[in-house]
Amino acid sequence: MKPWLLLVLLCAAAPASARTAFQARCEDTIGQSVSVMSSKQNGYRIDNSYSFHGLSAMKGERAPGSYVLGLTRTESQVRIGIQGRMLSDPATGYECVAPRLEVHMTYLPIVVYVGREFRPGTCAYREILAHELRHRDIYLNALPRAEKVVSDALARRFQGKPLYAPGGQARNLLQREIDTGWMPFIKREMEKVERLQAAIDTPREYARLGKVCAGEVQSLIRPAKSKRTT
C-alpha cells in the first residue's frame, strides 16, 4: 500500500500519552476506521443448449484435438465504497479521516453447461454433470475464503485508527490506495480459484470421462465431430 498512509498510520498508533492534541481530537471524536465486508452467492443454473463444438469454442484455448463436453463459467465482481468523517487542523496543516470501507464481493450466477449431445438422465450426462458440479462447488467455496483473507488484510492495514495526511489530500490519497492497491489485491484473491479449477481438469480425468459408461461418451461425440454446430 502507499507509503504515506503507512507512515501516518504508524504515527497515529503511538501510545496515548504521546499523542498530539490533534491526534487526540481525531481519535476521540471521529471514530475508528472500519471495514465492512459482504459477499453474495448468486446460485447456479444448468444449460444444455450448446453442442460440445460450441462449448469447445467458448472455452477457447485447449489441447489440440480435444473437445469440451461440459463447462462451468462465472465472473467475479468487486465493489468498494468509501465513507468516513474528517477533521482538519489549521495549526499543523494536516487532516485526519476515519474511513469506512464497504467491500462487496460476488460471483455472477454460475452457469453449468453440458453438451446437448448428452441427454439428461443418461449415464454420460450424469458423469459430465458430476464433473462440472465439482467446478461449481469450488466457486461456491472460494468466496467465503477470499472474504476472510481480504477482511484480515484490511484489519491489519487500518488497525481501527484514523489516517493522517497533508490538508486536502486524505480522501484523494485514500481513493488512490483503493484503486491501485486494494482493488487489484481483492481481484487477484478471487482469481486464485482458477488454479483450483485447473487442478480438476487433468489429463487423467479427461481420459476417465472418455471411457465411462461403456464408451457412451465416445459413441455420441464421434458422429457429431463432423457436424460442427453450436
Where are these regions (language model features)?
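Metalloprotease/metallohydrolase-associated module, dominated by Zn2+-dependent proteases
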Residues: 34-105, 110-116, 156-230
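Family-specific functional microsites
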Residues: 148, 155-156
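Sec-dependent signal peptide recognition
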Residues: 2-7
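Catalytic Zn2+-binding segment of zinc metalloproteases
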Residues: 133-150
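Cleaved targeting-peptide boundary
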Residues: 18-26
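Active-site alpha-helix of zinc metalloproteases
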Residues: 122-127, 136
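N-terminal signal peptide c-region/cleavage motif recognized by signal peptidases
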Residues: 13-15
